[in-house]
């Protein structure tokens, strides 16, 4: 029990440091959307006032093809952060994903910052989040914790390598994802955390039954910079540009299959990002 508490406290501190370090981060990478041009249609043949932005996502109708993606949870200040984010999601009727729930799955004392999202959103579309090493039971518990409509399985090898306490062995993750997809009844979304998903990886995921990919491309939150602030021994400035830019990752993944459902995230700051 003492060992579990110690691990939970380390995780909680790390999550707090992630927010603090993000806020003091200075590095800006680009997501390549500046190289994307939408073709102008001079003959749209539509009535602007008939445009309907609603769509069905994970079995629920949402008002816009937008979502508040996974950010945080697992420390005291995260309760207020997630509460405010959930209010925004509710006001616009868009989905919200929570940050990694691994800490709360292991220790119920840390559930509050995740459960607050469901408390605020009530019937809204909430998505769970946990790592690629999670067991089927852990995934199920993460979903049940917030009555989620689906679950994100996040992939973050670049971040882990830059963490002093991070994982170094990534063997078996694909097989584990395949097992989760087969045994979990809710939709499973495989998500990168800011370094993009390549065409090759998208193809491998599709082959094991993954239907939803969140590309999480380069251009937004930079976890190499965030972890660099935390690492007392090494600074990773030469790797701050690491990753597949969001726009490029989107094109690569879409080329795999028109049936693959893609969430495009990574530096989406404004319209025409």
Please report, for each region that a protein language model flagged, where it lies by residue.
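An N-cap/entry alpha-helix motif that binds or orients negatively charged groups
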Residues: 1-58, 62
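Hydrophobic faces of well-ordered beta-strands that scaffold small-molecule active sites
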Residues: 44, 66-69, 94-98, 125-130, ...
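Active-site cofactor/substrate anionic-group-binding motifs, chiefly glycine-
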Residues: 56-103
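Acidic (Asp/Glu)-rich catalytic clusters
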Residues: 56-60, 84-91, 114-122, 140-147, ...
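Alpha-helix-loop-beta-strand connector modules within alpha/beta enzyme cores
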Residues: 110-128, 170-189, 234-262
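Catalytic cores of alpha/beta
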Residues: 135-145, 195-212, 251-258, 262-264, ...
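Metal-dependent enolase-superfamily TIM-barrel catalytic cores that perform enediolate-based chemistry
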Residues: 139-196
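Glycine/Thr-rich beta-alpha phosphate-binding loop at enzyme active sites
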Residues: 148-173, 201-253
């Amino acid at each position: 029990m003492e060992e579990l508490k110690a691990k939970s406290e380390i995780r909680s501190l790390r999550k707090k440091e992630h927010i603090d370090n993000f806020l003091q981060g200075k590095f800006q990478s680009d997501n390549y959307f500046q190289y994307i041009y939408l073709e102008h249609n001079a003959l749209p043949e539509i009535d602007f006032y008939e445009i309907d932005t609603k769509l069905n996502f994970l079995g629920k109708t949402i008002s816009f093809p937008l979502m508040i993606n996974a950010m945080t949870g697992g420390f005291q200040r995260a309760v207020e952060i997630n509460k405010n984010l959930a209010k925004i999601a509710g006001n616009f009727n868009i989905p919200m994903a929570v940050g990694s729930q691994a800490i709360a799955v292991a220790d119920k004392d840390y559930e509050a910052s995740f459960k607050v999202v469901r408390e605020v959103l009530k019937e809204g579309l909430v998505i769970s989040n946990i790592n690629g090493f999670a067991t089927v039971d852990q995934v199920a518990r993460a979903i049940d914790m917030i009555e989620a409509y689906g679950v994100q399985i996040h992939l973050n090898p670049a971040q882990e390598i830059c963490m002093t306490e991070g994982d170094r062995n990534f063997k078996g993750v694909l097989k584990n994802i395949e097992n989760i997809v087969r045994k979990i009844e809710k939709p499973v979304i495989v998500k990168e955390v800011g370094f993009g998903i390549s065409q090759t990886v998208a193809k491998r995921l599709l082959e094991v039954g993954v239907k939803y990919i969140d590309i999480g491309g380069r251009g937004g939150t930079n976890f190499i910079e965030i972890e660099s602030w935390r690492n007392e021994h090494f600074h990773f400035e030469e790797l701050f540009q690491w990753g597949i830019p969001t726009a490029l990752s989107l094109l690569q993944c879409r080329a795999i299959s028109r049936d693959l459902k893609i969430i495009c995230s990574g530096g989406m700051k404004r319209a025409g990002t």
